[in-house]
Amino acid sequence: VNINSKNTFEVKHNLNFLNVGQGGLLDIIYQNNYLWVSYSEDRGNGKTSTSIARAFLSKKELNFKNIFQANPPIDSGYHFGSRLAIKGEYLYASAGERGMGMIAQDPTKHPGSIIRIHTDGSIPKDNPKFEGKSDWLPEIYQIGVRNPQGLALSPYDEKIYLSNHGARGGDWFGEAKKGENYGW
């Protein structure tokens, strides 16, 4: 959809997203002729995960390539999280804990964390794994979140903020903090 001209057109794409429970197409960002999409991906045997793909913008066809896949895949249609934000050369993403609770405290698994990668999918060398958190997966920026469905770069202080759905009304809003644990 072109919001100026009100014209619409269909674009072919190779994105294989799965509509399951709370999953499907989860977020999209456009910058410098690229699109990043977070989505729920079928990983086989009834298991799904939050994935991020990138494509060069074309009016005819989008050839998406996965640049991140949350592991492990889980047999659940809940809490994909999956919002995206770009700050400079970094792409931040939220990964919900998929309804698995304590998995958010395990830095060797992606669910329940904030992810930080470069916009091309490569891993920043100043992520927590390389600065004293050697047991953390290299893409993880922060752990201990439940179902973060908001993620944004503040124009006021240039920080990344997230909103997190808590259980039974325990929603909260806070800053994404490198190497920290929000405690879910």
Give the residues covered by each predicted segment:
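Acidic, Gly/Ser/Thr-rich repeat motifs that build Ca2+-stabilized beta-propeller blades
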Residues: V1-M102, G150-G166
